[in-house]
Every structure is written in C-alpha cells, then in structure tokens.
Amino acid sequence: MAAATVEIDESNGAGETVTHNITNSNMGSTDAVNLDPVAYPLAPGANTYIKYQKIHVTNIGTSSKIDNLKVWRTGALGVGGTHAHITNARLTSYAGAKAYATPVNTTPVATCDQVMPSSVPATANLGIGGSLTGALTAAGYSDYLGHQITTDASATAGSTSTMNYQYDETA
C-alpha cells in the first residue's frame, strides 16, 4: 500500500501566489510565506496578517479517501495582555469554503471569528468542498484555513506555538 502524499500550501499577496509544501506557519507583521518572526515581529496591540492555508493531497496513492480534517494549535500565545488565535475552522455551523482575499492585518476577517482549538478537535473542523463531511478521493485541496493572531497593548513578545494538521486516510 502506498500512502497518500500530503502537503500544506499557503497563498499570499494580491492576486494569490501559492507556495507548495511550506516549511512553517510563522505569523507576523507582514504577508509572507515561511515568515521569519524575528524580521517581522508583532507589536503589542497589533494583529498578524491572516494566513490562508490548504491541506493539499498531491497523490492519493492506493488510498481511497482523505477526510476528517482537523487543525489546532499547541503551545502558549505569550504572557501579559490578551491574545487570541482566531480562525474560520469550526465544528458546527461551518460557513463553507472560504474565498481567498489579499491578506490583511485587520480584524475581524470574514468568517474568522472562532478561537483556534488548543487540543485535537473531536470531529472535523476544516472542510473539503465546502463541507465538514467532504472527502478527497483523488489529488485535491481542502477548503482554505484562515487564521490570525490578535493582541492587545499589554501583550509581550516571545511565544512559540505549533500548528497541527490531522486527517483520516482510508485504504
């Protein structure tokens, strides 16, 4: 059995430039893929630029289906002040496939009004084809995951979090 080949892709810029198989999900004060947070730090009271990412099945292999997409964050967002990691990922009342728009650092970005889970969600929270019950049976993409970090003026720098992406693969 050959497992499916899966990568995380990110879209940036006006007109949407897609980068395949990104190396990190770092967030900061500019719209950039594989961002260096030291070069683009987030000032207290500011918001990161929204990230638009997709789970991309580049080859289904001998699998019959990829589904049950789950995304969450582990690790603290920092000390002092109020921080929020907001997203369009949700367990219920899914708003359907999010359309790409030039990334901004203002909030709220349409449909990114949920708190990013900090543990594995019980069920899918990112859709395929506009539905949380969607599935890929050939090479293809998830819906966009939109996510962004917001802070207040009392926030202090220096946090590290990890984005987690999980899916079910059926033989």
Predicted ranges, named:
Residues M1-A171:
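Long, small/polar-residue-biased beta-strand-and-loop interaction regions
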